[in-house]
Amino acid sequence: MTDDTAAPPPRGPARDWKSSPLVSGLLLGLFSLVSALMLALASDATRGPIAARSAEDLLASLAQVLPAALHDNDPTADIRTLADADEGAVRVYVATRGGAVTAVTFELTGYGYGGAIRVLMAVAADGTILGARVLSHTETPGLGDKIEIGKDDWIEGFAGRSLTDPGPAGWKVRRDGGVFDQFSGATITPRAVVGTIHRGLTLFDRHRAELLAPLPLRS
């Protein structure tokens, strides 16, 4: 075989472009970008309905503790935030009628047998409780869940109470020498709610002047 007819040197195996690290990195980046865009679009699509549902839930909760006759404003639009040394930042929904503050509503958290108990309470300008409701809890079904208005009317026993009715010694469950009933087989849960509502009255008393001050005029 002459030089002119010599066979070409053997060639190495052809590289598959799909296995290139550069291509793999580009594909991974493109996939991540598309996924992020899809998640952003989904978030935008659901944000509005979620916000609307939250606003509806808040209005429904306020209506359970705050009599409609006491306000001619929208308490969810007139909000004050208290900076309290014990409770931290507390969002307060202010009810007014004829420009005068008639009541305030706010949420505090206590801790029962099963964990956190969120309590919403409305307090009139004179310091009496207008109503209280448990918004969420993880207490034992059939025992501690009697703090729910749908399970028992126990929570309604706080309406009309104040820091002086009963006095300090009375703001306990009966087992501890107070005036509020406990549940059979469940004392920790009602004790936590009683304590939380008493804290709420104390919070109102500490910030009474600030809470009852006229709201700034809307521009």
Swiss-Prot record:
Keywords tagged on the record: Electron transport, Flavoprotein, FMN, Membrane, Nitrogen fixation, Phosphoprotein, Translocase, Transmembrane, Transmembrane helix, Transport
The entry's family comment says: Belongs to the RnfG family.
InterPro entries per record: FMN-bd, Ion_transpt_RnfG/RsxG
The residue ranges crossing the membrane are 25-45
Subunit notes for this chain? The complex is composed of six subunits: RnfA, RnfB, RnfC, RnfD, RnfE and RnfG.
Gene Ontology MF terms? electron transfer activity; FMN binding
Family annotation (Pfam families): FMN_bind
UniProt organism field: Cereibacter sphaeroides (strain ATCC 17029 / ATH 2.4.9) (Rhodobacter sphaeroides)
Q: Please identify the protein, giving its name as recorded.
A: Ion-translocating oxidoreductase complex subunit G
Q: Which cofactor does it need?
A: FMN
**Sorted alphabetically, which NCBIfam families does this protein's record hold?**
PRK01908.1, rnfG
Indicate the secretion signal residues.
Answer: none
Membrane topology listed for this record: Single-pass membrane protein
- The PTM FMN phosphoryl threonine maps to 187
- List the subcellular locations: Cellular chromatophore membrane
E.C. no = 7.-.-.-
| Gene Ontology cellular-component annotations | plasma membrane; plasma membrane-derived chromatophore membrane
UniProt main location, coarse: membrane
Function of the protein = Part of a membrane-bound complex that couples electron transfer with translocation of ions across the membrane.
Quote the gene name from the UniProt entry. Answer: rnfG
GO BP terms: electron transport chain; nitrogen fixation
